[in-house]
Amino acid sequence: MGGKRGVFHYLQRTAIQGSPTMISKIANNYQYGGDYIQTDVHPFKRHFEELQVGETIITAKHTVSEADIVNFANVSGDNFYAHMDATSLDGTIFTGRVAHGYFVLSKAAGLFVDAKKGPVLLNYGLDECRFVKPVYPGTTIGVRFTCKEKIAQEKRNPEDIAKGIVKWLVDVYDETGETVAIATILTMVKKKNQD
């Protein structure tokens, strides 16, 4: 087997080893734990071409309250015992009433989203979501919001908006700096050049 087919065949078995920073640079795909580029300009104010893989904002923080948990349960209908009944936690991994994982993710979105109209056209989805540490009332959370990957899209027709998909690493952390939730979200972002 020769030519391109042979190269692709053997590349399927290739693994790259290195630090998250090195792999991020080689693959142009941000790897968790790698160096990031902290910016003061919110990435939702930037067009697709202006975003850099590894570009990160650190958000404001929010202290989770019992009212947050009750309100989220009322809105979502998720009344799972670990969120609503502190007396039923014997024999579980929880030491007290715990916030909903989806509340933590929703609050993270409230912290990282810039609500003003800009190049971000829409939320395109969610991948790889994990809730890795319980969040109890009194826990303060913040978000490291990092441009993970950019995927250019072709216009479907001349009237279509020139755009691309941006994958973002959402790293929600507590007051100790430990990750409590991690996810990849996708947004559709307008290109500056509409040709």
Model-predicted segments: where are they?
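C-terminal segments
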Residues: 1-29
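A broadly conserved detector of short glycine/acidic/proline-rich loop/turn motifs that flank catalytic sites
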Residues: 14, 21-22, 63, 135, ...
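Alpha-helix capping at helix-to-loop junctions
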Residues: 16, 114-117, 150
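Hot-dog-fold acyl-thioester-processing enzymes
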Residues: 30-125, 192-195
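HotDog/MaoC-like acyl-thioester-processing domains
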Residues: 30-52, 131, 135-140, 144-195
